[in-house]
Amino acid sequence: MLTNTAPAPDRDSASSALARERGGAQPLTVRDILGAPLAHKAGRPMARAVIRGLLLAFGRCIVQVRALERIAADRDPFILALNHSTKLEALFLPAFLLHARGGKPLHFIADWNFKLVPGIAAVYGAGDVIISDRKPARPRWLNVFRPLLTDRMPAFSRAAERLAAGASVGVFPEGTTNRDPRRLLRGFHGAARLSLQCGVPVVPAGIGFPRHGNTPRIRELAPMTIEFGEPLTPPSERNLSGSAVRAWHARVMCEIARLSGKVWSNENHRPV
């Protein structure tokens, strides 16, 4: 216990210690969720409530986490790149990472059109999400709201700005939900290009579904495991040629495939 004369613990050090302590984490308990101080969200009670609410509702879906220390707050800046298999994981997985990092944001790039769903704007605000306006809304008439719900700066330009400031960014390079339990999508090159442009490492991560059996599609809220890989450091020369970006993207996707137990190829196929 600290005495009155002891210096206050550094917030990054405290959240990093929490991540390391949970390096081989099992499911969060209610005590874990409600007891975490979330020091980086001090003064933001709504954000703390949203993070805890998401974890209370969905946190039990995460049954095992390996090498969580690789995304600790004192490892910033980096780009977290992981596969994307269900819609709801895009809400509760960032909440889990915020919790593990003491509330320090890991700025995920997310589609603007989900802000049309009641309550999602609050979730995006709690996670300090970077908004992408790439996808249109359905039905089309909802696109009239796009200027009100998006940033004038392109998402990856905003992400580069955050990285330059020492923050970390999260990307689902597949670009959409892919319920195929065996194959990754070819994916988009944005995360690879951002890594090469900014000279920051990519931390690959694989989400696995150990209980999906032989079903052809991964269902919502299926129990999942998460494994974080070793950081991939980009070449020192900032080569943004098409071939260099494609090669770096392939390396990242192959690591995600290995960690998630899926396969990846450069051939395009439709998401399941």
Language model features with spans:
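Short, structurally constrained coil/turn elements
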Residues: 57-59, 74, 102, 165, ...
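Structural motif corresponding to alpha-helix initiation and N-cap regions
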Residues: 65, 117, 153-156
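Helix-to-loop junction immediately C-terminal to a conserved catalytic motif
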Residues: 52-84
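Catalytic core of membrane glycerolipid acyltransferases/transacylases, capturing the structured
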Residues: 33-34, 74-148
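Short hydrophobic helices that act as membrane-entry/anchoring signals
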Residues: 36, 40, 44-60, 121, ...
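Non-catalytic C-terminal accessory region of glycerolipid acyltransferases
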Residues: 2-34, 141-272
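Short amphipathic alpha-helical segments and helix-helix/interface helices
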Residues: 51-55, 94, 98, 120-121, ...
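Acidic/glycine-enriched edge-of-secondary-structure segments
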Residues: 47-56, 138-151
